[in-house]
Amino acid sequence: AASDVYKRQDLISTKDTFREILKKSKTSELNLYGFASDQSPRKNKANYWGVFLNNYVPIHTGAETIAKKYNMAVVFMDVQKIKRGYYEASFITITEEPKKYKDYEITERFIELLEKQIINKPEYYTWTHKRFKHRKTLST
């Protein structure tokens, strides 16, 4: 039942992500996975560097990798603050066919949407988070 959805939430550690998704992909259950994207990968583990808010930074690509491996849709959640304690989320489909995209194209689209969200409401962005831990400023 829809009311049971809150009882079936699981947090999956990074190291267990692939194993858990593989296990759940073998069932007939419908699953939704959300990825926190506010951290910077370790500098020596960064597979991809891209431009984010005029800084050249390492970017996690796990969501794109998993989407391609398991052929899962990728959706961006745009969250807007309505008033204190009230938020509204809308969902923007990036792709329903991730295997048709070149490497990092989905990640780049996600970054574009995130930048747009931040530029529209910069006061709600946590500027102190670790996204810029390993950055290189772009020259103009």
Spans of model-derived segments:
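Non-catalytic C-terminal accessory region of glycerolipid acyltransferases
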Residues: 15-140
